[in-house]
UniProtKB/Swiss-Prot annotation:
Organism encoding this protein: Paramagnetospirillum magneticum (strain ATCC 700264 / AMB-1)
Subunit annotation: Homodimer.
PANTHER family in the cross-refs: HISTIDINOL-PHOSPHATE AMINOTRANSFERASE, HISTIDINOL-PHOSPHATE AMINOTRANSFERASE 2
EC number(s) recorded for this UniProt protein: 2.6.1.9
Pfam families (alphabetical): Aminotran_1_2 (PF00155)
Similarity comment text for this entry: Belongs to the class-II pyridoxal-phosphate-dependent aminotransferase family. Histidinol-phosphate aminotransferase subfamily.
Protein name stated in the entry: Histidinol-phosphate aminotransferase
Length: 363
């Protein structure tokens, strides 16, 4: 007798491994591996979490009505077309389950978020990548990779792990070049950090047709990664599909309470944005002065390329940083083995990273 077998393709999935948070034998850790908010969550979010603790025996609002209404009011959106999830990851997975399956293809750029391939394989679809140009998604290459089997195109904009982005005009050109039956999912997890006049999170494209979804998260700017909360803005038909497929109580009450408080604390969000606006160029400039190649980023992290010389490569740098208690993200899983991704931390953390890498390169 054989054991129950999963669907074909499931065992081909390489499990996602998040950024490490501990080093054996090291007490003080600088965790700069997961692009978490440098300043932590809003004090008002923490207070909301404490205040709702006595009600944790109650089921949450399955429709996340208060949060959806707040998001809709802020951005001028139809709240009935907003769907909340346990992180935007859950929503990406549900979209794959609902719109792709065996024999279908899910398309994304070569260095797109690893979860896209996992979500595709989990529903039996085939992940397909399109070449990038200068570590940036390329519209022509994406459109050239479309086949009759393409059902979903994921576009991380800005992109993790490269930190690069496509201007709004290019994203609009991408959407215009797609068949109407292909779902374009714009993963805008880092949109709050972007300070570029030619950038858009893509909401206007959702309003313009029936095949664009924008996903957002509370894990980055709002620093609520531990609670798992995200949202999607969709055409009416797609929102209806998501609400049929998602679990009825997919977002917990603690996440909803803290998320609403964080969302309404605009002053704290502005503080976090200002922090990143200062330290992102500072850290990028400091590492460039050490002779390292820093990919221009609009996010709360930078991708740093190291020489391939033995002892000076990314692997050696990672090992050296870990010896100092500094955890960054190795990029081998993205096909960028000569790079490390470093989250923008507190001012002290950023200075310690520079000091450690200065020692490593012998500057």
């Amino acid at each position: 007798m054989t054991a129950p077998a999963p669907r074909p393709g499931i065992m081909d999935i390489r499990p996602y491994v998040g950024g490490e948070s501990a080093i054996e034998g090291v007490d003080r850790i600088l965790k700069l591996s997961s692009n978490e908010g440098a300043l932590g969550p809003s004090p008002k979010a923490m207070e909301a979490l404490r205040a709702m603790a006595p009600e944790m025996h109650r089921y949450p609002d399955g429709g996340a009505e208060d949060l959806r209404k707040a998001i809709g009011a802020r951005f001028g959106l139809d709240a009935s077309r907003i769907v909340c999830g346990a992180g935007s990851d859950e929503l990406l997975g549900i979209l794959c389950r609902a719109y792709a399956g065996p024999g279908d293809e899910v398309l994304y750029s070569a260095h797109g978020f690893l979860m896209y391939a996992i979500a595709a394989k989990a529903c039996g679809a085939t992940p397909v990548t399109a070449p990038e140009v200068d570590l940036t998604a390329n519209v022509d290459n994406l459109l050239a990779a479309v086949t009759p089997r393409t059902k979903i195109l994921f576009l991380a904009n800005p992109n993790n792990p490269t930190g690069t982005y496509l201007p709004a005009t290019e994203v609009a050109r991408l959407r215009a070049g797609l068949r109407a039956d292909i779902l374009l999912v714009i993963d805008a997890a880092y949109t709050e950090f972007v300070s570029r006049n030619d950038y858009s999170g893509g909401i206007e494209l959702v309003e313009a047709g029936d095949n664009v979804v924008v996903c957002r998260t509370f894990s980055k700017m709002y620093a609520l990664g531990g609670l798992r909360l995200g949202w999607a803005y969709c055409p009416e038909n797609v929102a209806g599909v998501l609400n049929r497929v998602r679990n009825p109580f997919n977002v917990g009450a603690p996440a909803l309470a803290a998320g609403l408080a964080a969302f309404n604390d605009t002053a704290y969000a502005e503080l976090c944005k200002s922090h990143n606006d200062y330290w992102l160029p500072w850290l990028s400039g400091q590492l460039a002065e050490l002779g390292l190649t820093v990919v221009p980023s609009v996010c709360n992290f930078i991708l740093v390329r190291f020489p391939k010389d033995a002892g000076k490569d990314a692997g050696a740098a990672d090992k050296f940083l870990r010896s100092k208690g500094i955890i960054v993200r190795a990029m081998g899983g993205y096909g960028l083995g000569d790079c490390l991704r470093i989250t923008i931390g507190t001012g002290e953390e950023n200075q310690l990273v520079v000091a450690a890498l200065k020692e490593f390169v012998g500057a």
